């Protein structure tokens, strides 16, 4: 089987969104993004078009890999094979050279997330040198909003990024890092002057992307109170399936339900 890799530089956001949807056909969690949402989502996550890749067999689409980068760390933000090519051991053949090229370009650490019940995917990534870091969850707020006093104040989104970025320093999952907020459509809300939340409107329902409580006010219930206020304010508010599982008590105490889906965060040192 002669497979040809081509850099994503050769394609538009419309084409890449189409390729991604085709390659995720039949997956337990299908991916379908409009060109605009593709560009906004992966642009915010730091897509590297030069490193992202589309594979072909002749004129037939085989697979796609979306790579995002920050300095010497890269992430496999999305990877999928067309249904006809699955179960044939192709992925390792495609990804190993891709990761080696990243190493040659100065990448020292690779990150990814994989659905927790995708045993084949987990086995593949372990064979490629990845190790599990933690379990990631998603949380769903109330499906209808409740009226009441508006205790949230709009603030300059950059205030939150400035406050949080230095403290976070790569300790959060990639999608929740405040650096991923900069080019997303989002608003930041302040609660009681010492707690902040970023809510994105990229998708059809609002998404809670980040919360931050000033260090000296932590342990006083600010985060739980703010989460409660937020899901009463925004109907259908949810998080990405990217929140470390250790935060489950905080979300459940604030009235959120835990989504059924889980992901594993994995990392490899090159």
Q: Which residues fall in each region the model found?
A:
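Conserved active-site alpha-helix within GNAT-family acetyltransferase domains
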Residues: 88, 92, 108, 116-134, ...
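Conserved beta-strand in the GNAT
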Residues: 54, 60-68, 75-80, 192-212
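C-terminal "cap" of GNAT-fold acetyltransferases
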Residues: 108, 115-117, 137-162, 260-270
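Conserved acetyl-CoA-binding loop-helix of GNAT-fold acetyltransferases
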Residues: 81, 87-100, 123-127, 219-232
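A short beta-loop-alpha structural element at the N-terminal edge
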Residues: 2-18, 148-164
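Conserved GNAT acetyl-CoA-binding A-motif
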Residues: 102-113, 232-246
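Active-site acidic-Proline motif in GNAT/NAT acetyltransferases
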Residues: 69, 82-84, 88, 116-117, ...
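Active-site rim helix/loop that mediates acceptor-substrate recognition in acyltransferases
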Residues: 18, 29-53, 57-66, 165-190
């Amino acid at each position: 089987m002669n497979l040809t890799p081509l850099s994503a530089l050769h394609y538009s956001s419309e084409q890449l969104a189409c390729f991604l949807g085709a390659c995720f056909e039949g997956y337990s969690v299908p991916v379908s993004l409009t060109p605009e949402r593709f560009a906004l989502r992966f642009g915010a996550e730091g897509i590297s078009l030069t490193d992202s890749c589309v594979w072909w067999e002749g004129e037939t689409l085989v697979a796609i890999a979306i790579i995002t980068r920050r300095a010497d760390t890269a992430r496999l933000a999305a990877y999928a094979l067309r249904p006809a090519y699955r179960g044939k051991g192709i992925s390792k053949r495609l990804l190993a050279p891709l990761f080696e090229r990243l190493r040659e370009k100065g990448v020292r650490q690779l990150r990814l997330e994989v659905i927790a019940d995708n045993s084949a995917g987990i086995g593949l990534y372990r064979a490629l040198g990845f190790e599990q870091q933690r379990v990631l969850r998603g949380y769903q707020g109330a499906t209808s909003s409740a009226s009441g006093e508006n205790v949230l104040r709009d603030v300059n989104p950059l205030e939150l990024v400035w406050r949080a970025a230095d403290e976070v320093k790569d300790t959060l999952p990639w999608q929740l890092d405040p650096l991923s907020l900069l080019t997303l459509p989002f608003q930041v809300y302040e609660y009681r002057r010492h707690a902040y939340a970023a809510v994105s409107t990229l998708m059809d329902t609002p998404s809670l992307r980040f919360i931050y409580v000033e260090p000296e006010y932590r342990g006083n219930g600010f985060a739980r109170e703010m989460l409660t206020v937020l899901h009463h304010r925004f109907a259908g508010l949810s998080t990405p399936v990217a929140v470390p599982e250790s935060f489950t008590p905080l979300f459940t105490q604030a009235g959120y339900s835990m989504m059924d889906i889980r992901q594993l965060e994995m990392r490899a040192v090159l």
